[in-house]
């Protein structure tokens, strides 16, 4: 079903997250790590559009680290054309991450090594471009899944933070789409007909996260407020960085509100 306001709704949720957690300041230069998937593409365009509503200016640049799985470079020209329309400079860095992970190292857990290599390369690229912040495309589903993965696999209560300081790098990681569900991101991308570059990772779709995603999806069939309840628990749990900076403002005042988001309009 078509939703002509999907992108506006997503930008509203991004604006709320940015304000609740003070993610962006005047003069910031923000780099978005673009994989080519729906999340990073939506994040890039959302940040570009938010410049009209936040009341101050900041720069947005986008970088793709092509892992070159099977030694094959990917064509990212559709993304380059899209970002150019929104005034976002875009670079593609060809890397050997794919061959290192799947051929030279032949890791039993390829996702862990791949994530470390990509993270290091991404942070280096941000420093080289003179950026002080890196925006990541994690949404609410990612946070919920990470929370339960940590609980089940490691027996601990924890999750990545909305804002993370990397003191040694002089960088700050921000996650502006944290209040939006994956469905809301998908609807925005579909409605705007943004181009997507499909992942060619050999491990795509067979990870532990995919299993956790299935669990969350199943729970939401019987409890539509499951994601929002988990978000509320994260914000009230005392986990570093999760309580909104502005006292008295939470992104989900009551789990009973289900899938409705407060103050999400631009």
Locations of regions flagged by a protein language model:
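Electropositive phosphate-/nucleotide-binding environments in soluble metabolic enzymes
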Residues: 4, 8, 41, 116, ...
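Short, basic, helix/turn surface patches
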Residues: 115-126, 163-169, 216, 220-236
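Residue-level detector of flexible, active-site-proximal loop/helix-junction positions
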Residues: 67-69, 97-99, 164-167, 180, ...
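Catalytic subdomain that performs nucleotidyl-dependent activation
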Residues: 60, 133-134, 141-218
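The feature marks non-catalytic terminal segments
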Residues: 194-266
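A general structural signal for short secondary-structure boundary/capping elements
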Residues: 107-111, 136-138, 179-183, 221-225, ...
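ATP-dependent adenylation/nucleotidyltransferase module used to activate substrates
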Residues: 1-147, 153, 183-191, 259
């Amino acid at each position: 079903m078509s939703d002509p306001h999907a992108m506006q709704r997503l930008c509203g949720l991004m604006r709320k997250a940015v304000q609740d957690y003070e993610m962006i300041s005047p003069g910031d230069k923000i780099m978005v790590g673009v994989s080519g998937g729906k999340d990073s593409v939506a994040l890039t365009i959302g940040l570009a559009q938010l410049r009209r509503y936040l009341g101050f200016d900041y720069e947005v640049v986008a970088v793709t680290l092509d892992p070159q799985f099977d030694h094959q470079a990917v064509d990212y020209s559709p993304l380059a054309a899209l970002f150019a329309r929104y005034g976002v400079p875009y670079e593609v860095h060809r890397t050997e991450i794919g061959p290192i992970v799947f051929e030279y190292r032949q890791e039993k857990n390829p996702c862990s090594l791949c994530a470390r290599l990509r993270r290091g390369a991404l942070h280096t690229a941000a420093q080289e471009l003179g950026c002080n912040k890196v925006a990541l495309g994690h949404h609410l589903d990612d946070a919920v899944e990470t929370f339960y993965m940590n609980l089940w696999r490691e027996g601990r209560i924890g999750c990545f933070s909305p804002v993370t300081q990397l003191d040694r790098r002089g960088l700050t990681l921000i996650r502006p789409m944290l209040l939006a569900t994956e469905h809301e991101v998908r609807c925005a991308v579909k409605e705007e007909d943004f181009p997507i570059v499909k992942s060619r990772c050999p491990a795509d779709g067979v990870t532990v996260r995919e299993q956790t995603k299935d669990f969350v999806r199943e729970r939401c069939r019987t409890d539509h407020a499951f994601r929002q309840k988990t978000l509320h628990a994260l914000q009230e749990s005392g986990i570093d960085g999760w309580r909104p900076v502005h006292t008295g403002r939470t992104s989900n005042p009551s789990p009973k509100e289900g899938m409705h988001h407060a103050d999400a309009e631009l």
